[in-house]
Regions:
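Solvent-exposed loop/linker segments at secondary-structure transitions
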Residues: 115-254
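Acidic, metal/ion-coordinating pockets
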Residues: 1-139, 144, 186-198, 209, ...
Length: 254
């Protein structure tokens, strides 16, 4: 069954007053596959907003695209109530006209608590957005935890089928390993040095080891002990180490 192009949910408050909130979803066309049809994000957004706006009290866009594109979207469709965004790994907040844009940190390190207050008499909408850090002070939601445990079990079985034991400790002691995107994309860290050293050990005849920093996806600081799961979530794309002979002139260009 295909996903619906739009979604409307009805909310009811304590006195029985109802509000209909429409949702549209947008994502950037990344890693295009031949079996998927892609449309222009902004054209699609306008189309689905126009379909929803007269049948609900507010329209919210849930997006996964660059902040600049979320800003462009807010300017293109000023009637949107809110854009809940993703893609960047650091928190962002902006208000473009009357459109709020919120993005929390990656890896569930933080979350936005967003409250939409709608006056049904004059249709005035006010929004309050607060960001909280997700840590041990935040109580685990029982219903959410059921889903988390279900998918953790599915993931662990999948890892096991590939020969991994997600809970097995690879490194017991040592300093935390810095895999934060803001650092590994611009400089060396102890984690990137460890990865390069591992490749050099696997390919002892190589003079140079090169790693695409974009393949390191953890965007976090790994605390000891480090498990096989930490390795998987740090380098989830897999692939092989390739040894290539090349001239120094080509290496400089790379």
């Amino acid at each position: 069954t295909p996903f619906p192009e739009t979604y409307i949910r009805t909310f009811t408050d304590a006195d029985g007053t109802t509000a209909r909130i429409g949702f549209i979803g947008l994502t950037l066309p990344f890693n295009k596959a031949a079996f998927v049809t892609y449309t222009d994000v902004f054209t699609a957004a306008q189309k689905y907003y126009d379909q929803l706006k007269d049948s609900c009290d507010a329209v919210v866009a849930i997006t996964h695209q660059a902040m600049d594109d979320d800003i462009k979207l807010a300017r293109q469709i000023p009637g949107l109530a809110l854009i809940i965004g993703g893609h960047e790994h650091e928190r962002h907040y902006a208000k473009i006209g009357n459109v709020y844009i919120t993005k929390a940190d990656a890896n569930a390190k933080s979350a936005y608590i967003i409250k939409l207050n709608l006056n049904k008499k004059d249709h005035a909408l006010t929004i309050k957005a607060d960001i909280i850090d997700v840590n041990e002070k935040v109580a685990i939601d029982a219903a959410t935890d059921v889903v988390v445990q279900k998918w953790t079990g599915i993931a662990n079985k999948s890892y096991a089928s590939l020969g991994f034991d997600a809970t097995k400790v690879c490194m017991q002691n040592g300093e935390p390993l810095d895999g934060r995107e803001a650092y590994i994309r611009t400089q060396q860290t102890n984690f990137t040095r460890l990865i390069v050293s591992s490749i050099e050990k696997a390919s002892p005849a190589a003079d140079v080891a090169i790693v695409n920093s974009g393949s390191i996806r953890v965007d976090d600081i790994l605390q000891m002990p480090v498990t096989q799961y930490d390795v998987i979530r740090s380098l989830p794309f897999g692939g092989s180490i390739m040894e290539v002979d090349m001239k120094g002139s080509l290496l400089i260009k790379i």
